[in-house]
Amino acid sequence: MRHTALPRVRSIGAARAASTAAPAPGAARSTAATGGGAAGGPRHVGRRIAVLAACGVLAVGCAEAGTAGTDSAGGNGGASSPVKVGLLYSKTGPLAAYGKQYLEGFKAGLDYATKGTGKVDGHPIEFVEQDDAGDPAKAVSGAKELIGKGYKILAGSTASGVALQVAPFAAQNKVLFISGPAAADKVTALNKYTFRSGRQSYQDTLTAASFVGDAKGRKVTVLAQDSAFGQANVAAVKAVLGKEGATVDAVLAPPSATDLTPFATQAKAAKPDLLFVAWAGETASALWTSLNQQDVFSSTRVVTGLDLAASYPLFGPAGEKISFLNHYFAGAAGTDIEKAMTEAVAKGGGKPDIFTPDGFTAAQMVVHAVEANKGSADDTAALVKALEGWSFDGVKGHLTVRAEDHALLQPMFQVRLTGSGAAAKPTVEKVLPSEQVAPPVLAMVG
C-alpha cells in the first residue's frame, strides 16, 4: 500500500543506516534566556533566535513519499506484525536543528531499549517521520493522516505550539502521544493520553531559582524584551520566586532596541541579588557585551539558560561570568546510558546536544509501554497505564513519569562556560535532583 502523504516506514535497522536532516542554517533557540546560532552567521543567527523565541520555551508537512505500511498499525496482526510509531517533529523549519537532535536520540534510544533487535516480543518497532516544520496546522494534519492509518502511538513535537494542538487531537482519538522538546507547562496534565519525554518550563525556572538559595527577602530582576516571550518569563519568575518571598521586578526593553546600554545600566541600578536574563533575537550578543561593559557581573549574580552548542560563542567574554541553568549538554550526565547514546549517535555521524535525550527517552517510553502489553499497541488505555508512575534510568539519570499529571521528573544542571568563542566549553557545577526541580502536581484536565 502506498500513500504519498506519509514518509517512508523505517524499522530500527533501517534507521541506523538512514541519513538525517541537517540543521537549518543558524537554527537555535533560547531556553529561558538568550539563544544561539550555527554557521549561518550573526544575521542569520539573530533571525533564527527571534523565530524560536516566539515559540516559547520558558515561556519552541513536508512529508517524504513512501510506503505507508499496513492498515493495522497496532501490532496484533500476528507474531511478527510491526508496531507503528508516528514521529511528528521539525525535520525542516526554524527548529530543524532540534528536530535532528530528537530524531538521532530516538534512533539511539530504540536501539538501546530493544537491545539492538529493534523488536519487542518479536514485533518490530517501526516509525515514520512526519515533518511538521514547527507548524501546528501541519502537525495536526499529519497526526490525522497517521491516526487514519491506525497508528496508536505518536511522538515528537519540537515546538510547544505544535504539542498543544496535537495533544487534544490525540486524546479525542484515544491515541498515545509522547511530546518531545516542547517545554510549555500546559502540556503536563493536558489529558490522560499525553506524556512528555523532555523537561518543562517550570523545571527551568526552579533551576534558575536554585542560584538564589533562600528566596525570602531577596530581590530578583528580570531583564527581558517587552514581548510575549519576555513577559512570560517575568510571570514565570514571579510565580516561582515571588511565591517563595522574593521581590521580583523587571527591566523591559523594546524588541526593536539596538542600543542596550541604558537597559544594562537600569538592571545594575536595580541592585538585585539575582539578575535573570531572558533574551532572544539578533541583539543577544550586543546585550551580553553591554552587561559586561557596564560591569554588571561584579555587582550581582547573572543567570540565564544554556542552549545548544552552536549558541555558546554568542556570550563572548561574558560567558565565563554567567551562571547557567541547563537541561542537558553533551557529557553533562556521566551515566552509562549517556555513554551508550553518545556512541550510537556518533556511529551515525552525529553528536549529542541539548535535545538528544528527549528523543532517547521517548523511545524508552514507547518500548516500555509496548513491552508491558506483550508487543501490542492496540489497547491505548493499557499503554497509558504502563507509563503512569514508571521510574527508570535514562540519559540524565533516574527519571519518573509522575502518575497524577504525567510530568517527567528529572535532574537539571547548574553549568559554567569556560573559554569564549569557538573554544567555549560547558562544565557541570551542580546536579539538581529531580525532587528539587519538580513542578507542582496538577489536576488532569482531560
Walk through the language-model features, giving the residues of each.
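Beta-alpha junction/loop-to-helix N-cap segments that form part of ligand/metal-binding clefts
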Residues: 70-72, 98-102, 112, 116-188, ...
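Extracytoplasmic "Venus flytrap"
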Residues: 69-109, 117, 130-137, 159-161, ...
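Extracellular/periplasmic periplasmic-binding protein-like sensory domains
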Residues: 290-360, 371-374, 432-445
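Periplasmic-binding protein-like
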Residues: 87, 146-158, 178-180, 219-224, ...
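C-terminal motif of bacterial Sec signal peptides marking the signal peptidase cleavage site
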Residues: 58-61
